[in-house]
Amino acid sequence: MNSITWGTTPWGQPVPLHAAWHLLWWALALGFGILVVHAVWKALQKPGPAAPPAPPALAACVPARVPRHSLPARLFHWFMAACMLTLLLSAFLPKAGVLFPWVGVHYAAGLLLIFAIAFHIVHAVFFMDFRSIWPTGADLAGFGQGEDAPVAARPGKYPLANKLYHLAIVVVGLTMVVTGGLMLSRIRTPFFTRNPYLFGDAAWGGIYLLHGLAGISLVALVIVHIYFAARPDEQPIARAMVTGSMDREFVLTHHDPAKWGCEPAETK
């Protein structure tokens, strides 16, 4: 099965048109497949020994509620989620036969997402701990050691799974907004003059293809994200995106406070 739908120019040259429709089913299968495999693995996993306690000097600097997400970061998360879900529904429902004036809805949600991501980049780079969300060699060394891992082997603010998911969303999200922004030049909007000749046929085909692949990939990512957010053992992390903070006990048993910026009193 061809993963790319091809067309031809008036001169008989083959050009890509968009990602093949059947790839959406592969994305759904991948998302639900990861869900099932992980759920079965966790169900069969035997309880391990209790997590070793953090050193008293280190535990003493951890407050009852540990700040994790600022209000702007939380607002961006939920606003981005609303935009992305709107984009997915307005992209795939018409293809499934649910017809409505989707073009205006789609490009409006896309523009809002572009502005939101631009805000988040500035906010993350200049007002947040920008490096804490990116995977490092230390994350790989401590990955998979379980809850009974020594404190020094535990993650800091973000576990490796969170960092890898964020990296995937960055790649998919930026691909969507860059290609989508270029595609806006092909339709009539109140913001700029329509110019379908900004690129040649082959370039437009590549842009549409990348946009479609990003949208299809987002389907699998959304399924995985909702699944992990709904898991009982992930509730402290999920609730932090609403409340902005995490319980002290969860931090002490699942994270290394020192990597989270906690400095014992004796070292200050």
Where are these regions (language model features)?
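Membrane-embedded alpha-helical bundles that constitute the cytochrome b-like, heme-associated redox core
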Residues: 1-268
